[in-house]
Amino acid sequence: MSPLRIALAQINSTVGDLEGNARRIAEFAERAHAAGAHLMVTPELALCGYPPEDLLLRPDFYRACARSLDALAARTANIAVVVGHPEQYRGDYFNAASLLRDGKVVATYRKHRLPNYEVFDEQRYFSAGYQPCVIEVQGVRCGINICADVWEPGAADAAMQAGAELLLALNASPYHMTKQATRYEVLRERIQATGLPVLYANLVGGQDELVFDGASFAMDREGRLTHQLPQFSEALAIVEYAGGELRAGAVAPSRTLEAEVYEALVLGVRDYLGKNGFPGAIIGLSGGIDSALTL
């Protein structure tokens, strides 16, 4: 049997720019299709950007997201896509991920674990889902989790019990120093508990005070890293799954800590200016260490 080819789409979304985000997802889907992928996975809430905050208190925003999702499904009919988006369903609101296939929305997963600490306040906006979602692509059963779902036991186990052979994790995981090592540790715990290989698609870009570093990756059922996308830039990688195993692929080189922090600062400032439409910036130099770092 030919391998299942899954594209990890490391996308830089802008909060509230539904048209621009959908266009970017469609562009990545075209690239993934051209590379022979059967399925593409986006980051968490890629359609609306993360964190959308009080936009999620507006019913018209959910309606606009639903229209954008339907239009995106029509634009990506030549490849299956799992896309993160907010959803209004039966009077409740969810952090969701849907499978788009053949021009339609055919399945939806609703995030189980809603973080409510530090920069996260998802319980303010969303209800928690409770059902697993397992989709079949090229004969392979893929479970879906969203970000915090893989940081605790429960949701990944439910996907495994529902028959998943591998796990697709959509994420909007902000950067801090040593964060990637923590992600590896957490995902290896889920892999050890479930026996499922994991494909981890993370958001990249600056949004207000947050920086998302991307660094998406794939791990096999032994917890070995098979693919690693770069930090702080958009990227697309094709992961092959055959015979119950992930095939080894490209692993981006790691940076020194100093280079990593520098790239995070550059990306955060660049996107803060660009996404807010500022024409430039005035830099006030006091002579302290903050001024030296800015220069």
List the predicted regions and their residue ranges:
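Enzyme catalytic cores with a strong preference for nitrogen-chemistry domains
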Residues: 1-284, 289-295
